[in-house]
Amino acid sequence: PLLLTSPRAPTRTRVPGPPIFTPLLISQARGSGAYPHPMPGLDPLPERAVIREVGPRDGFQNEPDRIPTDDKVRLIDALAHTGLRRIEVTSFVRAEVVPQLADAADVLERVGIPEGVSVAVLVPNAQGLEAALEHVERIDEVAVFLSASETHNRHNVNRSVDESLAGLTELLPRIAAAGLRPSASISTAFGCPYEGHVAAERVYAIAAQLAEAGAQEISFGDTTGMANPRQVRAFFTQALRTLPGVELTAHFHNTRGQGLANVLAALEAGVDSFESSFGELGGCPFPPGATGNVATEDLVSMLHEMGVATGIDLAALLAAGRDAQTVLGRPLGSHLLTAGPVVWNG
């Protein structure tokens, strides 16, 4: 039976300011055994990586059939007990624009997320932030967003990039003043389905303005899966030099099968923070061909096999993915949900 409901969770005690992420041990990464052979010649990878699960927002918003709130709450609660440290629970957007997220407030109030797991929400504008702040005791992080390309930004939020920047740079200090961690997401950072190439210098300039306004973290999104590993490595190598002191996060889509290759390229450049979606759910509902975030299960498996710690229980994560398949009534795109984790014999 899948209509189990989670009891209304008690108000969480939240320490103001950015969430503290406890260092992870390499031994935590070895769910099925780290890769058993040395790989000389490769750049050293980070010892650990932090994963921000965006499936409950980025994944659910793309589903054409309404997902019952009870099911959303149960799936989010399951994710919160996998070892994930950060979960983007929902977005406060207009219900007529994204009907699937019309229950944002109800979901946020009902999820039973334990201490130590950072709750994030996405907001598009001042109205969205005001709605989110009505639930300030249930939130740790608030993300704002815009696109690097003019056409995609018009399609997504009906504003020019400059207009979006003007509004968002006013929101970021308000988020911090509420005791929450402000972050920003830049879509079409590696290419636009309408305009094609997006200059990296343009993306860095947008990111710099957001950082100056108070964004502690900036996520760079490959919105329609146009990025390639060589491009990603060069992009983040320069971004880490251009934006010192800002946490840089990579968000890849697997639209053309290059998602995990791009993750590896970002790791080799020095990035240790990633966004992904359990079951490979999601994408962006507006541009063509934008389906398929990198699957969290596949990402965690690859990281663990390379000896990069995440602190995530892969078996528990797979159980949440299987439950999501049942709720949605179809197989999901995660390779690990089909093949299972790697098992080393001998």
Task: Locate predicted features.
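Leucine-biased recognition of intrinsically disordered, low-complexity hydrophobic segments
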Residues: 2-4, 24-25
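Catalytic cores and adjacent flexible loops of soluble metabolic enzymes
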Residues: 33-346
